[in-house]
Amino acid sequence: MNKINIAIDGPAAAGKSTIAKRVAEALSMIYVDTGAMYRAITLAHLEQPETEIDKLVDHIDLKLVNRSGQRIYLNGSDVSDRIREHDVTLNVSRIASIESVRTKLVNLQQNMTANKGVVMDGRDIGTKVIPEAELKVYMVASVEERAERRLIDNRNRGIASTFEELKRDIERRDHLDMTREISPLTKAEDAIEIDTTGKSIEEVTAQIIELAKSAM
């Protein structure tokens, strides 16, 4: 079988990261969570609001480590849990729309996929980061289901939230992601759309694995 890259795009809480991790594990590929990278930059900005974002980005050290599940390090510190907190979630779409931030991270992400064998999820993977990916998937789900998933995830992390609050946050993020000037969330022309509403993790994972095997 030939080595391939798999691009998985879609809106917030569509199940991209959960599915992408499982697909990568099943196919012995490398998983890259680009959303975590943007969240880490957002956290850095929240912690140093007085520093111009362009200067901040130039001096940030980001590392993804696949050890007991992927961990992300910001300037040497493990921020994998901190970047999932509500203040980061509220600000990540705004920070991700800044040109200098996207330029730095897209360059990093493209370097990661140069040797293939990568499953990468995000908002612009199939359209901007690796438009030449052998398999492109665009995952969607209803706003209600995505809010419920995020609610369960927050409970598991000990984060207080309500369904209505999360539904509003997701609708706001959808609008920001789809209307931003730089690399807006959009489906690549040759991407395969999968609606995960009402489907199990196992069902969607199996579907993408079969698509990947056909592309190898």
UniProtKB/Swiss-Prot annotation:
Single GO BP term: nucleobase-containing small molecule interconversion
Catalysed reactions, semicolon-separated: CMP + ATP = CDP + ADP; dCMP + ATP = dCDP + ADP
Domain of life: Bacteria
Binding site for ATP: 10-18
InterPro entries on file: Cytidylate_kin, Cytidylate_kinase_dom, P-loop_NTPase
Family per record: Belongs to the cytidylate kinase family. Type 1 subfamily.
Major site of localization recorded for this protein: cytoplasm
Keywords in alphabetical order: ATP-binding, Cytoplasm, Kinase, Nucleotide-binding, Transferase
Subcellular localization, as worded in the UniProt entry: Cytoplasm
Main enzyme class: transferase
GO molecular function terms attached to this record: ATP binding; CMP kinase activity; dCMP kinase activity
GO cellular component, one term: cytosol
Protein name, as recorded: Cytidylate kinase
PANTHER family to which the protein is assigned, alphabetical: CYTIDYLATE KINASE, CYTIDYLATE KINASE/PANTOATE-BETA-ALANINE LIGASE
EC number: 2.7.4.25
Organism: Macrococcus caseolyticus (strain JCSC5402)
Alphabetical list of CDD domains matching this protein: CMPK
